[in-house]
A protein has these predicted regions:
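Sec-dependent bacterial lipoprotein signal peptides
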Residues: 1-12
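Non-globular, low-confidence helical/coil segments that flank catalytic cores
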Residues: 11-280
Length: 280
């Protein structure tokens, strides 16, 4: 009788812990860092690690510290959405410290190929490839789909259209991610013309979460874009010095969207079978 009671007590004590461990095993963590008006999203399920953009040059150490805190020792996929300094600046730091299995970058030549951030990025990538620290590099023109465990990635380029003569923000890769029924969209810095093209081409799909394009800068196609995406959550990468535009915030409020600003701190996103949880 005593043995039976002890067994029941042990079973009751262990079951919640096992459930918690199972939930932790299936959890995807996404950190959108507070690094001013710059982009860096770190994504990991504990096995696969993805980094989307790398902030400014001075952000490299902070990005590295955030990755270390998440237990990341190598990068499976490093995705550069476009070649502005607030998206590639920290890449040399990451390419020197971490082994990168695959780097994906946009297939265009920036207006200024002599810009310090771009030259530093190219030099660091060349060195990483020569030293075997970057397994492969792919310039994405059309689209690339990848599936790793419970993570599905789709990376969309411009399908050969070159916007760089006018505004290379529009050459941004747009990254969508699915995990256990939860959907996320990282829209780089796309602006009015690219949004117009993507809407007309049917390349905008609904999702649960949106990293708002171009740091919350308003344009007249955002309302149509937000309506099509129909997200529940949004994050804007901005700073007190360079805040999101009020018109953009008003559109998000009108959509009933729960909006986070990185000027208020790093955004912590957790995706599980139960849904999406976001804290700041």
């Amino acid at each position: 009788m005593i043995a039976a009671l002890l067994f029941c007590c042990l079973f009751a004590a262990c079951t919640p812990k096992n459930d918690a461990n199972e939930a932790l095993k299936d959890m995807l963590k996404i950190e959108i860092l507070k690094i001013g008006k710059a982009d860096c999203s770190i994504i990991t399920d504990g096995t696969t690690s993805i980094v989307v953009d790398c902030g400014e040059e001075d952000d490299g150490a902070e990005i590295s510290a955030a990755m270390d805190a998440l237990g990341i020792s190598s990068i499976d996929y490093l995705i550069i959405t476009h070649y502005d300094k607030d998206h590639i600046g920290g890449a040399p730091t990451l390419l020197k410290k971490y082994k990168v299995s695959k780097l994906l970058e946009p297939d265009y030549t920036p207006v200024d190929t002599t810009a310090y951030a771009y030259v530093s990025y190219r030099n660091a990538l060349t060195e990483a490839e020569a030293n075997g620290k970057c397994g492969s590099t792919e310039a994405v023109s059309d689209s690339v789909s990848l599936t790793v465990s419970d993570i599905k990635l789709n990376i969309v380029g411009t399908f050969g259209k070159d916007y760089a003569k006018n505004q290379d923000n529009n050459d941004s890769l747009v990254v969508s991610l699915e995990h256990l029924g939860n959907s996320f969209l990282f829209a780089g810095d796309i602006e009015k013309q690219r949004i117009t093209d993507m809407l007309s081409q049917g390349r905008v799909q609904p999702c649960d979460f949106l990293k708002v394009p171009h740091h919350g800068v308003y344009n007249s196609k955002l309302e149509d874009y937000f309506s099509k995406v129909n997200m529940k959550y949004a994050v804007i990468t901005c700073s007190d010095k360079n805040p999101a535009e009020q018109k953009t915030l008003d559109l998000l409020t009108a959509k009933g969207c729960r909006t986070f600003l990185t000027s208020n701190g790093t955004v912590h996103i957790r995706s599980t079978k139960s849904g999406i949880d976001i804290t700041q």
